[in-house]
């Protein structure tokens, strides 16, 4: 069974996604990240909040899992 979501800030999520090859391409209140994958541009938007609400964090995890395998993302977003 999965543990609950971690409490993360926007900056922490940006750092996590950077580890998977995403780079900041702009934004202040909402940070836009992009990487170039085998199917073209892969873009994510992360609110620059501290902390990010649980619902928003779930959505970011879900969107990121379109580009990065959930098994690799899970330890960064969830407590076990």
Which residues are covered by each model-predicted region?
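N-terminal first-folded block
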Residues: 1-26
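Ribonuclease/tRNase effector modules and their secretory precursors
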Residues: 1-4, 35-38, 71-80
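Generic N-terminal initiation segments characterized by hydrophobic and/or small/turn-forming residues
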Residues: 2-5, 14, 41, 54, ...
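Short, flexible active-site loop motifs that bind/organize anionic cofactors or intermediates
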Residues: 3, 47, 63
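Generic detector of leucine side chains in alpha-helical contexts
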Residues: 5-8, 17, 33, 44, ...
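A short, structured beta-strand/loop element
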Residues: 23-59
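C-terminal structural segments of small proteins and small subunits
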Residues: 51-80
């Amino acid at each position: 069974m999965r543990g609950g979501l971690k409490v993360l800030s926007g900056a922490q999520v940006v750092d996590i996604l950077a580890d998977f090859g995403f780079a900041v391409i702009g934004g202040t209140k909402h940070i836009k990240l992009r990487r170039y994958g085998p199917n073209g541009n892969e873009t994510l938007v992360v609110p620059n909040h501290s902390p990010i609400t649980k619902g928003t964090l779930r959505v970011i995890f879900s969107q990121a899992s379109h580009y990065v395998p959930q098994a690799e993302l899970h330890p960064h977003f969830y407590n076990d």
